[in-house]
Amino acid sequence: MWLMCTQKTGLSAKGLQRELGLGSYKTAWLMLQKLRDAMVRVGREKLTGTVEVDETYIGGQESRVGGRELVGKSLVAIAVELEGKKVGRIRLRHVPDASGQSLVGFIEDSVATGAEVHTDDWNGYNRVGQAGYRHRVTPVLGDPKRALKHFPHVHLVASLLKRWLGATHQGRVTGKHLQRYLDEYAFRFNRRRSEHVGKLFHRLLEQLVLRQAKTYLEITRAK
C-alpha cells in the first residue's frame, strides 16, 4: 500500500510484482484492485459551485457515426468542480452510453443539487435542469476546437487521465475493470496538493478499515 500511495504516477501490477518479488502476477493485480476498491469513500461529499461536465473516449478514436456512438471503446463521464479559474475536485465514471439516463444519473450522483452544471448541447444533458441544477449550455456544434475553448478544465482532466493510463498501465486497462482505475486517478488527483507524501497512505488506510475487502471472484465477476 505504501508503494502504491507514494509513487507519484501510481503502480502497475507488473511493477508491484517486481518490487515485492512476487511469483504471481495475479497476486499483485488482486492486491492493487482491492486497494482501488477502497479509494471511494462511502458518503463522500458531492461537487459544488460551478461544475463542468463532459465525456471522453478511452482506448481509441471517437466514431463519427451517430454522434457519440460507442464502437468497442470505453466512454468516461467527467465532472470538474471549478475553483475560480482553477480545477478543483473531480469525479469520473465509466458509463455504458451517452444517454440522458447515464449522464444525468452520473451528475446526480456526483454533483450537489443547486450547483451550476455547465455542459455542451448534447441531448443527453437535456434533463439536467429538471434534476434540480442550474444548467448552463454552451453549443459546440461537434467542433473539437470549440469544445476545448469552452470546456478547458474538463478537457485538461481528460488529457491527464489518458496520459496516466498510458504511462503507468501502458493503456492495458479493460472496460470491465476501468472504473477502479478511474477511482484511483480521482483519489490521487483530488489530493494532489497535499504537502505530505503520506497523506494518501493514511487516508486509504482509514478507508480500508471501514470496508470489507472483496474476494478474487467478486472482483473478477464485477461488470
Residue ranges and their predicted role:
Residues 1-223:
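Residue-level recognition of single "structural anchor" positions
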